[in-house]
From Swiss-Prot:
Name this polypeptide is given: Methionine--tRNA ligase
Origin species: Oceanobacillus iheyensis (strain DSM 14371 / CIP 107618 / JCM 11309 / KCTC 3954 / HTE831)
SUPFAM superfamilies in the record: Anticodon-binding domain of a subclass of class I aminoacyl-tRNA synthetases (SSF47323), Nucleic acid-binding proteins (SSF50249), Nucleotidylyl transferase (SSF52374)
Location of this chain's protein in the cell: Cytoplasm
One of the record's GO cellular component terms: cytoplasm
Enzyme's top EC category: ligase
Summary of the function given for this chain in its UniProt record: Is required not only for elongation of protein synthesis but also for the initiation of all mRNA translation through initiator tRNA(fMet) aminoacylation.
Alphabetic keyword roster: Aminoacyl-tRNA synthetase, ATP-binding, Cytoplasm, Ligase, Nucleotide-binding, Protein biosynthesis, RNA-binding, tRNA-binding
Residue intervals passing through the bilayer: none
Location (main, coarse): cytoplasm
Assembly information from the UniProt record: Homodimer.
Residue span of motif 'HIGH' region: 14-24
EC number: 6.1.1.10
């Protein structure tokens, strides 16, 4: 059982099927905030994140790229780690489900379930979505396709909209129904287990009370996964493989179980609302079958949406965190994500809201308070923070009360993972301190030598307020609190020690900096909002320090067409023409007539088109940056071993071909009619 001062928090492990966006960062930053808060309060924290690296989708992607699944996930895992480093995530471990120790324990657990009779062998038939790794019944499908007799012959996943396929295969099943009553009793005895409360009602009413169906826990149609030792043609399916990462990462089932003994059960599994069922039904039941303690809490947060719904490259509304960090700094992103949305609810990202938060909260309220305070202490007290002498002015007591209440409410909200509310308390203090300056009018008091004590009290009260704000901001912002402490003349050891919070603790005669540098410069709202929208529209908001051409695979691009997709080449009456920007152009090795284009046509990623015009362009680089016209809905085909995802229009005259150019101001992906 975990020791009293231990705290274990986890993100879901991410599936490495594509570049992570701001929504993934939202979950991971939230966990990081909680981990940093608990460390600040003296807890011994273990923060886990990682990657879920098995499954049919990964096997297929690797095959398309002509590399091994292991090589594919190795590359994707490194990309994840790089992003977490950029966001300064303080995780203690990054687990990968391809680790040998994890695979061994997963196989052992599967065999134990089998021996206990919790798992049985049967046959399964159902509609399966590869990207979602989920089976669906006919009644769950969307956009159902039927034959002339009314039989279902296809459809789409209700979760993602991806096409499904009918699969019939032998599978092992877990007897979920065996544990349904025990799970309900656990919910009753542990009312805080599922947060927010609405998620618990959803699980009970939609899944448990109607009758828990037994769960398919193995597959035979792919091989990239953990083999079942007693029946090697079966691969352990995602539920047992992925969910057990939370205990295998701590050494469960290994020779060294010291971390498991200390930190399990988990204090918090942080998940998105779309996977709450797996963590609050499947995972607890598996732990019951293993006779292990259940997690203390599963917190299912909402989605970070755009005004036009979920993020989608096809809509041109995906935001990658690297771009925001590079242009505005990490603190701005972390603050916005935790402040803008009530944690647990859905929130909407807009460029205008993001820039406004930075300007009003960080630059105006916090930044100006720090700048004014440092400047006045330098001007009136030669840079020395005066001694705290309690309530001297008629406004001192109210500011102290505001600070004390803010700290108390902040602690309550942080414990409940209501991060937006916790930050509101910090800004209540900051706003009150700014008002305190206007009330006390230090520039007038300074003219009267007989009011020197009042002036000194104002200065130290402002310094104390900023110190308290910096301490409360530590879990959220990884740079600004240190800068505030430095400008106030406090060393990091004292200035960022939670035990020093409270008025009367500021060291007398501390020397502030001579001139503080603004920690959050003001931004031009219109200019910066336009910049972000441009990055979203053009799909160029990946980290600019990264070479885009390095690991791009056109097979991963989700081609977007408003007309019927993938028509055959002889059916041109349905042709769709689009504007595309040339991002790269080069000759195809071993093919004298072919040029290979990388194009931004407003798709879910860049597309690749091969065109037989090499003899007319001796320097293909000259085409980079041009806007061209493409046939967007041709079925992709292979040419000289390369995928070609459309056709570039060219005009023929005097026996030569020249690319048809679109207007330079036309947005990428716009239709031509």
């Amino acid at each position: 059982m975990a020791r009293e001062n231990a705290f274990y928090i986890t993100t879901p492990i991410y599936y490495p099927s594509g570049k992570l966006h701001i929504g993934n960062a939202y979950t991971t930053i939230a966990c990081d905030v909680m981990a940093r808060y608990k460390r600040m309060r003296g807890f011994d924290v273990f923060y886990l994140t990682g990657s879920d690296e098995h499954g049919q989708k990964i096997e297929q992607k690797a095959k398309e790229m002509n590399i091994s699944p292991k090589a594919y996930v190795d590359d994707m895992a490194e990309g994840m780690k790089k992003l977490w480093n950029t966001l300064e995530i303080s995780n203690d471990k990054f687990i990968r489900t391809t680790e040998e120790q994890h695979k061994k324990v997963v196989a052992d657990i599967f065999e134990r379930f089998l021996e206990q009779g919790d798992i049985y062998l049967d046959e399964y038939e159902g509609w399966y979505s590869v990207p979602d790794e989920t089976f669906y019944t006919e009644t769950q499908l969307e956009d159902v396709e039927r034959d002339d007799d009314g039989n279902v012959i296809g459809g789409k996943s209700p979760d993602s909209g991806h096409p499904v396929e009918l699969i019939k295969e032998e599978s092992y099943f877990f007897r979920m129904s065996k544990y349904a009553d025990r799970l309900l009793k656990f919910y009753e005895d542990n009312p805080e287990f599922i947060q927010p409360e609405s998620r618990k009602n959803e699980m009970i009413n939609n899944f448990i009370k109607p009758g828990l169906e037994d769960l398919a826990v193995s597959r035979t149609t792919f091989s990239w996964g953990v083999q079942v030792p007693s029946n090697p043609k079966h691969v352990v399916y995602v539920w047992i493989d992925a969910l057990t990462n939370y205990i295998t990462a701590l050494g469960y089932g290994s020779e060294d179980t010291s971390l498991y003994d200390k930190f399990w059960p988990a204090d918090v599994h942080m998940v998105g609302k779309e996977i709450v069922r797996f963590h609050t039904i499947y995972w607890p039941i598996m732990l019951m079958a293993l006779d292990l303690p259940l997690p203390k809490k599963v917190f299912a947060h909402g989605w970070l949406l755009m005004k036009d719904g979920k993020m989608s490259k096809s809509k041109g509304n995906v935001v990658y965190p690297e771009m925001l960090v590079e242009r505005y700094g990490l603190d701005a992103l972390r603050y916005y994500l935790m402040r803008e949305v009530a944690f647990g609810s859905d929130g909407v990202f807009t460029p205008e809201d993001f820039i406004s938060r930075v300007n009003y909260d960080l630059a105006n309220d916090l930044g100006n308070l720090l700048n004014r305070t440092v400047a006045m202490i330098n001007k009136y007290f030669d840079g020395k923070v005066p001694e705290f002498k309690g309530e001297v002015t008629s406004f001192d007591g109210e500011l102290q009360t505001t600070a004390n209440n803010a700290v108390k409410e902040y602690e309550k909200h942080m414990e409940g993972m209501q991060f937006s509310d916790a930050l509101k308390q910090v800004w209540i203090l900051i706003s009150r301190a700014n008002k305190y300056i206007d009330e006390t009018e230090p520039w007038i008091v300074a003219k009267d030598e007989g009011r020197r004590n009042e002036l000194a009290s104002v200065m130290v009260h402002l310094a104390e307020s900023l110190h308290a704000a910096a301490l409360m901001l530590q879990p959220f912002l990884t740079h600004a609190p240190k800068k505030i402490a430095e400008q106030l003349g406090l060393g990091e050891e004292y200035g960022l020690d939670w035990g020093t919070i409270g008025f009367g603790n500021f060291p007398e005669n501390t020397t502030v900096v001579k001139k503080g540098t603004p920690i959050f410069p003001r931004l031009d709202l219109d200019e910066e909002a336009a910049y972000i929208r441009d990055q979203m529209a053009n799909g160029a908001n990946a980290a600019s320090s990264e070479d885009e051409t390095g690991d791009w695979d056109p097979n991963e691009t989700d081609l977007v067409s408003e007309k019927e997709k993938q028509i055959k080449y002889d059916v041109f009456d349905k042709v769709e023409l689009k504007v595309a920007e040339v991002k790269d152009c080069s000759k195809v090795e071993g093919a004298d007539k072919l040029l290979k284009f990388r194009l931004d046509a407003g798709d879910n990623g860049d597309r690749q088109i091969l065109s037989g015009i090499a003899e007319y362009y001796s320097e293909p680089e000259q085409l980079i940056g041009k806007k061209v016209v493409i046939v967007a809905n041709l079925k992709p085909r292979k040419m000289r071993g390369e995928i070609s995802q459309g056709m570039i229009l060219s005009a023929e005259y005097d026996g030569k071909l020249q690319i048809v150019e679109a207007p330079s101001e036309a947005p990428n992906g716009s239709s031509i009619s």
